[in-house]
């Protein structure tokens, strides 16, 4: 069996045991894997589904996902041939169960969790910086968010050693707001390590690759597809115009770095997390990049920026000019 961090979207919410998916990268991976694989457990898209997909040999195999944040538990049962030690494909069954939280907590598990909460709190409650107001992850009408822009600025600063000129952050990787009201006893406007980690919890590396101006334009065009829109959060050094009245693939113009127009042949050092550099969220142009440089973890870059620039104001969301 294969566990893969990629999945599909659900067209309309239905029972978690059904398969109302819009075929996407998860289905394509599940359909293309070796016929010897009997089960594909997917993730990433935070959906609930139990599907059967034909493998390359034309045989059905399960392709499942159990939503996110512990809301669904996928129960998978199968038998193994004792002689061959192979999974009997016809015996595989899968069911998604909604977590209702109606069961009595196990005292031993609760005690174990509490022990680690107390140990982690020493690190989590450590102040790392200050903010002047809540810095939100929700995008503005231009598709930018103050927090997304802040993270891009932090990653650009952390990647200067790798020659970075601009940075781009995927909006899905911004997991929570930085709130001005205190979450504990730290005081209003104080950012703790735990709060910063909640914003950036993936431990991705900040990396840099070289793209041409033409490749950067194609990368930015990948923000819009027939299925979805994902606006990359730009560092302050990058500005451009996006004309939404034009066809998909022809919307981006007037790209500038530090106010200077970008040419197609120009070589640009672009910073992003390793998820994006690997082509994640459909930004495949990143994989054309050369001269890879790897730097710090994204959380370390974020914490360092907050510490160095406190108190931090919410960045303006004026780096992309939209025409509608």
Question: How should these model regions be labeled?
Answer:
Residues 18, 105, 120, 140, ...:
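Generic alpha-helical structural element
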Residues 18-126, 227-231, 247-253:
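Active-site-adjacent helix-turn-beta-strand microarchitecture at beta-sheet edges
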Residues 5-7, 44-46, 68, 171-173, ...:
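Short, ordered loop/turn segments at secondary-structure junctions
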Residues 1-15:
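Short acidic, glycine-rich surface-loop motifs adjacent to enzyme active sites
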Residues 53-62, 72, 86-88, 94, ...:
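Feature captures C-terminal
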Residues 125-144:
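Glycine-rich phosphate/diphosphate-binding loops and the adjacent beta-loop-alpha structural elements
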Residues 11, 48-50, 176:
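Conserved protein kinase catalytic core
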Residues 1-2, 40, 44, 78, ...:
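Divalent metal-coordination and catalytic microenvironments
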């Amino acid at each position: 069996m294969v566990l893969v961090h990629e999945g599909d979207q659900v067209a309309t919410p239905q029972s978690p045991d059904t398969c109302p998916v819009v075929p996407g990268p998860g289905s394509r991976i599940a359909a293309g894997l070796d016929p010897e694989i009997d089960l594909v457990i997917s993730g990433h898209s935070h959906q609930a589904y139990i599907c059967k997909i034909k493998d390359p040999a034309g045989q059905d195999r399960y392709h499942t996902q159990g939503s996110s944040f512990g809301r669904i538990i996928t129960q998978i049962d199968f038998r193994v041939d004792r002689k061959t030690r192979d999974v009997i494909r016809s015996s595989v069954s899968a069911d998604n169960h909604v977590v209702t939280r109606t069961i009595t907590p196990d005292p031993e598990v609760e005690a174990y969790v509490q022990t680690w909460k107390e140990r982690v709190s020493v690190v989590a409650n450590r102040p790392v910086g200050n903010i002047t107001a809540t810095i939100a992850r929700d995008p503005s009408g231009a598709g930018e968010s103050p927090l997304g822009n802040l993270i891009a600025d932090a990653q650009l600063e952390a990647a200067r050693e790798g020659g970075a000129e601009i940075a781009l952050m995927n909006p899905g990787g911004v997991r929570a707001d930085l709130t001005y009201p205190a979450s504990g006893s730290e005081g209003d406007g104080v950012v703790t390590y735990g709060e910063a980690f909640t914003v950036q919890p993936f431990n991705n590396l900040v990396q840099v690759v070289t793209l041409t101006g033409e490749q950067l334009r194609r990368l930015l065009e990948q923000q819009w597809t027939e299925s979805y829109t994902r606006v990359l959060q730009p560092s302050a050094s990058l500005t451009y115009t996006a004309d939404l009245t034009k066809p998909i693939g022809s919307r981006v113009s007037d790209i500038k770095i530090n106010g200077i127009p970008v040419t197609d042949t120009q070589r640009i050092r672009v910073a992003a997390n390793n998820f994006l550099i690997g082509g994640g969220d459909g930004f495949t142009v990143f994989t054309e990049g050369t001269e890879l440089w790897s730097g710090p973890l994204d959380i370390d870059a974020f914490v360092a920026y907050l510490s160095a620039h406190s108190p931090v104001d919410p960045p303006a969301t004026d780096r992309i000019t939209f025409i509608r």
